[in-house]
């Protein structure tokens, strides 16, 4: 499979979407401003990166889009813990700091769901039909995990997917089924997004939870009252996407591959309390 062709074709069809100030789904406009930077796939780091255009190397980078000087200038403002605003700021798991709108050294790049009308003739559920062409859904190799999401192409660190979709519920007793809901905390408001109904959710509902810390390659975070998933480890072709669904992330013990139990890192303000899968 031609990775370059896949990426470029996908970007041309869907546009470039990167979380931005006040709107994690904002599209960076193509303007007449000076463009001294490039958004690239960095082969060395296996990650989305921002570099100066003069340093672009076809052997090291796959170019995605030009970025204007103004676009880059607004990135990476460090925010103290006390000044954090969930509608403006995103926590960088690499730097362990808050940035507005996100970290410039470890930028985010949003891939949208496949947009379509409900097809009554399709054998696939609506949530399965929202799957981007970068993935496929098939039986997971994890024991008793059911269906899972598998990468068709290399997926770099920094890619963002979402938001997680489903029914908005006020209490757990409203869930259709356990294991598919995230708790959203926004100021004094608390509510759940229940993705158990495959006809009212999206493809993110099929992403399974890892058995061990080392298996996790995605991280869930909340911004603007919505849940997004971001890639924190490079995902190879035919590798399954895995995100932690702990009922009390940061406080519960998890088991490593060697059988030892330890506590997960406590600081991750964007992980929401979700029902375990």
UniProtKB/Swiss-Prot annotation:
Domain SET stretches: 135-246
Alphabetical list of CDD domains matching this protein: PR-SET_PRDM7_9
Binding site for S-adenosyl-L-methionine: 245
InterPro entries: PRDM7_9_PR-SET (IPR044417), SET_dom (IPR001214), SET_dom_sf (IPR046341), TR-Histone_Methyltrans (IPR052296)
Keyword Ligase: no
PROSITE patterns cross-referenced by the UniProt entry: SET
GO biological process: methylation
Catalytic activity: N(6)-methyl-L-lysyl(4)-[histone H3] + S-adenosyl-L-methionine = N(6),N(6)-dimethyl-L-lysyl(4)-[histone H3] + S-adenosyl-L-homocysteine + H(+); L-lysyl(4)-[histone H3] + S-adenosyl-L-methionine = N(6)-methyl-L-lysyl(4)-[histone H3] + S-adenosyl-L-homocysteine + H(+)
The UniProt record lists the keyword Cytoplasm: no
Compartments reported by the entry: Nucleus
Organs and tissues of expression: Expressed in the germline. Predominantly expressed in primary spermatocytes. Also expressed in the oocyte-producing germline of hermaphrodites.
GO molecular function, one term: histone H3K4 monomethyltransferase activity
GO cellular component terms listed in the entry, alphabetical order: nucleus
EC numbers, comma separated: 2.1.1.-, 2.1.1.364
Gene deletion effect: RNAi-mediated knockdown partially suppresses the sterility of spr-5 mutants (by101) and results in a slightly increased number of eggs laid as compared to the spr-5 single mutant.
Keywords assigned by UniProt, alphabetized: Methyltransferase, Nucleus, S-adenosyl-L-methionine, Transferase
Primary localization class, coarse: nucleus
Family annotation (PANTHER family): AGAP007109-PA, C2H2-TYPE DOMAIN-CONTAINING PROTEIN
Family that this chain belongs to: Belongs to the class V-like SAM-binding methyltransferase superfamily.
Name of the protein in its database record: Histone-lysine N-methyltransferase set-17
């Amino acid at each position: 499979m031609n990775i370059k062709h896949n990426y470029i074709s996908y970007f041309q069809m869907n546009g470039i979407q990167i979380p931005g100030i006040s709107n994690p789904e904002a599209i960076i406009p193509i303007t007449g401003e000076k463009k001294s930077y490039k958004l690239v796939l960095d082969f060395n780091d296996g990650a989305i990166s921002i570099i100066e255009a003069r340093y672009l190397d076809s052997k090291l980078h796959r170019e995605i889009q030009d970025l204007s000087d103004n676009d880059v200038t607004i990135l990476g403002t460090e925010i103290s813990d006390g000044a954090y605003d969930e509608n403006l700021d995103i926590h960088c798991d690499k730097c362990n700091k808050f940035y507005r709108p996100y970290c410039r050294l470890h930028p985010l790049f949003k891939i949208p769901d496949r947009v379509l009308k409900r097809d009554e003739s399709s054998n696939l559920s609506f949530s399965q039909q929202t799957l981007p062409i970068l993935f496929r859904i098939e039986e997971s190799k994890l024991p008793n995990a059911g269906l899972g999401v598998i990468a068709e192409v290399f997926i770099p660190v920094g890619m963002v997917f979402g938001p997680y979709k489903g029914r908005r519920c006020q209490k757990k007793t409203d869930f259709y089924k356990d294991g598919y809901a995230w708790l959203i905390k926004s100021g004094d408001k608390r509510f759940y997004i229940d993705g158990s109904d495959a006809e009212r959710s999206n493809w993110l509902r099929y992403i399974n939870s890892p058995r061990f810390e080392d298996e996790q390659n995605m991280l869930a975070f909340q911004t603007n009252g919505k849940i997004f998933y971001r890639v924190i480890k490079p995902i190879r072709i035919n590798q399954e996407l895995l995100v932690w669904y702990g009922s009390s992330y940061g406080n519960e013990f998890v088991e490593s591959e060697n059988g030892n139990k330890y506590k997960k890192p406590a600081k991750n303000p964007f992980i929401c309390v979700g029902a375990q899968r």
